[in-house]
């Protein structure tokens, strides 16, 4: 597929959101927040025909949120670590994806020494079908963190987020005090900054964005070591946004730029650099 068509394919939701916000600025729209949530998350629900498709080596996990009115259930995948006492990673995926389409990256993380719990937020995969928001995905991330604490007490825990999941991970890291580290890949400083990085960024729509995911403001509050990874060929989230997020973080921290890494290939291409950074920043795999 030609490069310009690939760019349009992946950025079409962003273009649609820009167009909608511009129109709403003049016409007004009571469903503006709803439309933003649909376009930003692009939630992918699995049908009943998809259910029960076991993935070799991974176990299904179900987590209930009893505090929420509907008592929603989250589906997740658990991949045991290479050793019984391996550190545990909470894996938070990005927009459009679900845990089953993230298995390749989950396995990469195990190869780096982690046991991994990956969760689907409400509205994704087999989790309760509900339109996600910035607040509900945060609740879901906290539920996943609590599950790890309950099921694997005493083990070191790390938070990982890819793309939009990186913003969810940053927020979670500001709200828990028992993480050993925060790792984000292919992520950004804020949703407004993503739009401003595009050729249409001059449009005056920033005040209309309700799902802001302001990681740049939050990451300065993160007290654990931070690893920021980005591919230098990422055509969806510019590496400059990953670097800007890194610049806002406290020390100790590390920025890794993976040569030739795209938004989806960076994790695989950067395994050696990941190992080096994990050893230097967290003492893992030493």
Labelled PLM ranges:
Residues 233-237, 263-265:
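Acidic catalytic loop of the alpha/beta-hydrolase fold
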Residues 68-147:
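Membrane-embedded segments
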Residues 152-163:
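Alpha/beta-hydrolase fold nucleophile elbow
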Residues 221-223, 228-230, 234:
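Short beta-strand/loop motif that positions the catalytic acidic residue
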Residues 167-224, 268, 272:
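Hydrolase active-site cap/lid region
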Residues 24-66:
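An N-terminal hydrophobic leader/cap segment in hydrolases
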Residues 105, 215, 224, 238-247, ...:
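Short alpha-helix in the alpha/beta-hydrolase fold that links the catalytic acid
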Residues 243-264:
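Catalytic histidine neighborhood in serine/cysteine hydrolases
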């Amino acid at each position: 597929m030609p490069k310009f068509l690939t760019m349009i394919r992946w950025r079409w939701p962003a273009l649609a959101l820009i167009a909608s916000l511009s129109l709403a600025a003049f016409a007004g729209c009571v469903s503006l927040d709803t439309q933003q949530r649909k376009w930003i998350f692009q939630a992918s629900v699995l049908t009943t025909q998809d259910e029960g498709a076991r993935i070799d080596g991974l176990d299904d996990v179900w987590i209930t949120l009893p505090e929420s009115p509907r008592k929603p259930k989250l589906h997740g995948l658990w991949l045991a670590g290479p050793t019984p006492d391996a550190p545990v990673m909470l894996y938070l995926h990005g927009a459009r994806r679900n845990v089953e389409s993230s298995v390749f990256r989950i396995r990469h993380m195990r190869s780096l020494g982690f046991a991994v719990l990956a969760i689907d937020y409400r509205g994704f995969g087999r989790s309760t079908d509900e339109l996600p928001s910035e607040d509900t995905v945060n609740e879901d991330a906290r539920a996943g963190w609590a599950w790890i604490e309950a099921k694997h007490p005493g083990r070191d825990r790390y938070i990982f987020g890819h793309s939009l999941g990186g913003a969810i991970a940053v927020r979670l890291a500001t709200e828990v005090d028992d993480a050993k580290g925060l790792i984000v890949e292919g992520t950004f400083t804020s949703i407004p900054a993503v739009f401003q990085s595009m050729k249409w960024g001059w449009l005056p729509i920033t005040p209309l964005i309700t799902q802001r995911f302001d990681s740049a403001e939050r990451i300065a509050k993160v007290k654990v070591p931070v690893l920021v990874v980005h591919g230098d060929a990422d055509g969806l989230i510019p590496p400059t946004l990953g670097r800007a997020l890194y610049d806002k973080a406290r020390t100790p921290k590390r920025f890794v730029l993976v040569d030739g890494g795209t938004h989806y290939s960076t994790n695989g291409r950067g395994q050696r650099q990941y190992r080096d950074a994990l050893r230097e920043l967290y003492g893992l795999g030493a």
